[in-house]
Amino acid sequence: MGRWVESRGVLGATSTLLMAFGLPQVGADSIPELQTTVTTLTRHIDENPDSASNYQSRGVAYFELGEFEKSISDFDRFIQLHPNQEPHHWQRGIAYYYAHEYEKGVQQFELHKSVNPNDVENAVWHFLCKAKLENVQAARDSLIPIKFDSRIPMVQIWELFSGIGSPEKVLLAAGPIDTGSGISRQRHCYAHLYIGLYHEALGQTKLVKKHISLAADEFSMQNYMGMVARVHNRLINH
């Protein structure tokens, strides 16, 4: 889904087209800074209403602010301007999840499979939407099969959601914690994010907070999924 490239080129390639239209670098901007960004982008959109990059960037800013319906609206406009990008737009699928539009989320992640068939994260978000729409067993029964995702610990994350793995195996695969290593930090950020989301699907609130907090704080990353962890952490603590 283009969120993390460790030893593999496919994932980076899948979002290259979106990035060309202005997928911004995502940091830990404060709420006032994000609101200023939205104001600036809105002015640019007023001046040039057919600028796809500005809609994409504002959609990301709205998502980070927790304004998910507005985020989806901007992503929709981006796709209207560039229809060929719809299968690539996993960001809209994640926004659907947080906006409780689970059926649309399922559809988006099934569409993304057509351009990125071996992405564990896509399979997981499809599972999460399906679990909310129906139940965990239905989500597990329709879990998108993945031939191979080389990113550590994605194999173990897929096994967790499939029912044959465990959170402990995910963390073991992530390896020893090395605070001085960006790769170690990244692996543990993703491990805790997806363990937290797994517990959310199972309704285990305390474990959700534990793992999402670790992904958002101790192992925070300045990338899109690091931002998702921070947004989720804010939602469950307010």
Regions found by a protein language model. Give the residues of each.
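Register position in tetratricopeptide repeats
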Residues: 64, 98, 132, 201, ...
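Canonical positions in the second alpha-helix
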Residues: 44, 77-78, 111-112, 215
